């Protein structure tokens, strides 16, 4: 992958993750989840065939639409300690991922760019799923965890 495209893609992914967990609106969170699935499509299209990557994109966007249909009336209330915890988790996981993911390339046969993004999404999803009390946030966290696993698996 071209380095500039990787930097742009990781910036969009980090901003999407931050927007998902710091927004009070479910629709805003779901829009950024759709953007996250679009970034995943661009990553998977480089490794998988275009048809499989498109199926993954359509499946993700349909998941976003279905969740929007059922959870559009849910209102999220963010409190200051939770916002600080989310920001600290994103920063902590980002630092750990950028520090240790390149060493994982000796064990996993994958480029370091895919491994960095996959491990970042996997760890963020796992931490958020473990610390969220809201079922909507837990569901979104599990979808992010599965996205990270798919990128690592690809």
Q: Could you say what each language-model-derived stretch is?
A:
Residues 1-154:
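Alpha-helical transmembrane segments of multi-pass membrane proteins predominantly involved
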């Amino acid at each position: 992958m071209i380095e500039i495209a990787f930097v742009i893609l990781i910036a969009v992914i980090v901003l999407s993750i931050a927007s998902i967990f710091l927004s009070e609106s479910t629709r805003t969170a779901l829009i950024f989840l759709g953007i996250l699935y679009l970034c995943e499509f661009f990553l998977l299209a480089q490794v998988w065939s275009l048809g499989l990557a498109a199926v993954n994109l359509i499946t993700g966007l349909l998941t976003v639409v279905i969740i929007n249909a059922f959870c559009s009336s849910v209102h999220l209330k963010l409190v200051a300690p939770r916002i600080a915890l989310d920001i600290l988790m994103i920063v902590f996981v980002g630092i750990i991922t950028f520090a240790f993911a390149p060493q994982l390339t000796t064990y996993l046969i994958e480029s370091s760019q895919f491994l960095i993004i996959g491990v970042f999404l996997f760890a963020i999803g796992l931490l958020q799923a473990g610390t969220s009390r809201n079922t909507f946030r837990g569901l979104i966290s599990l979808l992010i965890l599965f996205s990270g696993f798919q990128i690592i698996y690809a």
